[in-house]
């Protein structure tokens, strides 16, 4: 170490190559009174060397601690500035856009060319297809019982390759039922059955059974029920009653009793005040 190169005869410390702490120690030694012997000066010099090393280590620890603190603060600041651009929330204006679409459709004639042309203009300047606004518009039209507009909007969405979901199919089948279009409903149902054979929910089967029962197509009701049996989908209570009624209209009393025994037993279980309770099932004379 440079501090240890002390000339005992001259009493001078060479200051070249020394750190700040070492220079301070050397100046303190020069200002102190001359030592009586070389051994005492050597002992003090050894103590100064140890003290200078200790001060350098402490200074290094302080520097490293300060750098670590600054880096941690910088990391926290960077974390606050992160943005997840891949997360896309529902826009707040989709509801108003749906209302504008419903208002536009209500003022159009019932011609297919006029409706499709207006819908194409509505979506022309959109970067992405406004599927949320279109779905909300379908729900609004359904609540208003504007079944013809529901059919037009749903068909237009499907022609664009959008909205091919079970919810859209359910609304469209209901609109076909209410608008007396059983043939179009059957065509759509056959497409759904061949395309989504293993993923058709029970709600859609119930919709078709209700549609055919509403139009007194009892043989079609039995066909849909046979598809449910093949796909191992259990009918709900209303669907089972309609199937039993269809068997009765077709004079198949044995099958009717089988349906009643399998799916409509004398008792059923319901939940009342958080408890499972067995109650007697009600049977009407039409069942």
Swiss-Prot record:
Its main location: plastid. Coiled coil: none annotated. Residues 1-34 form a transit peptide. Keywords: Chloroplast, Plastid, Repeat, Transit peptide. PPR repeats lie at residues 165-199, 201-235. It is found in: Plastid, Chloroplast. One of its GO terms (cellular component) is chloroplast. Disulfide bonds: none annotated. Belongs to the PPR family. P subfamily. This is Pentatricopeptide repeat-containing protein At4g18975, chloroplastic. It comes from Arabidopsis thaliana.
């Amino acid at each position: 170490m440079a501090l240890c190169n002390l000339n005992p005869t001259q009493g001078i410390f060479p200051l070249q190559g020394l750190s700040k702490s070492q220079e301070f120690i050397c100046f303190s030694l020069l200002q102190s009174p001359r030592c009586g012997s070389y051994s005492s000066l050597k002992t003090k010099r050894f103590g100064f060397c140890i003290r200078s090393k200790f001060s350098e280590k402490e200074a290094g620890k302080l520097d490293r601690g300060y750098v670590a603190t600054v880096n941690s603060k910088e990391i926290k600041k960077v974390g606050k500035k992160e943005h997840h651009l891949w997360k896309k929330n529902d826009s707040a204006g989709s509801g108003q856009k749906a209302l504008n679409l419903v208002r536009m459709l209500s003022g159009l004639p019932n011609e297919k060319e006029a409706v499709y042309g207006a819908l194409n203009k509505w979506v022309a300047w959109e970067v992405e297809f406004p599927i949320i606004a279109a779905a909300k518009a379908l729900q609004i039209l359904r609540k208003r019982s504007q079944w013809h507009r529901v059919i037009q909007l749903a068909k237009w969405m499907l022609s664009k390759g959008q909205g091919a979901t079970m919810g859209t199919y359910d609304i469209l089948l209901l609109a076909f039922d209410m608008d007396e279009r059983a043939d179009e409903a059957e065509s759509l149902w056959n497409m759904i059955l061949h395309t989504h054979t293993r993923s058709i929910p029970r709600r859609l089967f119930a919709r078709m059974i209700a549609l055919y029962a509403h139009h007194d197509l009892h043989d079609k009701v039995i066909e849909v029920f046979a598809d449910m049996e093949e796909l191992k989908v259990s009918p709900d209570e209303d669907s089972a009653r309609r199937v039993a009624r269809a068997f009765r209209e077709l004079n198949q009393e044995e099958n009717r009793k089988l349906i009643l025994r399998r799916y409509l037993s004398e008792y059923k279980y319901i939940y009342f005040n958080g408890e499972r309770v067995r109650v007697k099932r009600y049977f009407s004379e039409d069942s």
